[in-house]
Amino acid sequence: MEKNESSAIEIAESSKERKGKAPLLAAAVGHDRAAGYKRGVSIFDLILRISAATAALAATIVMGTTEQTLPFFTQFFQFRAQYDDLPTFTFFVVGMAIVTGYLILSVPLSIVCIARPVAIGPRFLLIVCDTVTAVLATSAAGSSAAIVYLAHNGNSDANWLAICQQFNDFCQRVSGAVVAAFVAVVCSS
């Protein structure tokens, strides 16, 4: 060898150094677009779920606290309107309370779907339970909407009088609760 030349000496790796290294046989794994899409849908689902829970809770509270008393001639003789005077409104309060409870309790499962977007089990369970609660919320809101319509307009064929001329505050609160329930139905569907 001459002065300017250098030579490389190869030293074999010990068995300790080789254990921690794996040979590179595959290319780097790219970003999975399907998982990103599912994560985005799950985030949107969580936002809608929280919105529906808020609307359902508001509808339940407003309907459950609705009452109005009208004095008639004296203080001892009064007309009183409460939500529980009509079984449809009682069904509304119970049904929307169940929907609210489910929507609040399903938020953690929705978060699991965000963290693990490819998990099929939690997503399927949410779809089935969401369908059941959407039907319950729709039936509660629809039946109450029919009674609110009768309260506003009456039915001359059945000789039912409109009561909203006398119980204006009661009718306004009940109408607001029904609108909030339909908002919850749209958000939870």
UniProtKB/Swiss-Prot annotation:
Membrane topology: Multi-pass membrane protein
Xref: InterPro entries: CASP/CASPL (IPR006459), CASP_dom (IPR006702), CASPL (IPR044173)
Signal peptide: none
Any one GO BP annotation for this protein: cell wall organization
Extracellular topological domain residue ranges: 64-90, 152-189
Keywords: Cell membrane, Cell wall biogenesis/degradation, Membrane, Transmembrane, Transmembrane helix
Main location: membrane
Compartments, record wording: Cell membrane
Role played: Regulates membrane-cell wall junctions and localized cell wall deposition. Required for establishment of the Casparian strip membrane domain (CSD) and the subsequent formation of Casparian strips, a cell wall modification of the root endodermis that determines an apoplastic barrier between the intraorganismal apoplasm and the extraorganismal apoplasm and prevents lateral diffusion.
Subunit-level organization: Homodimer and heterodimers.
Protein name: Casparian strip membrane protein 1
Source organism: Striga asiatica
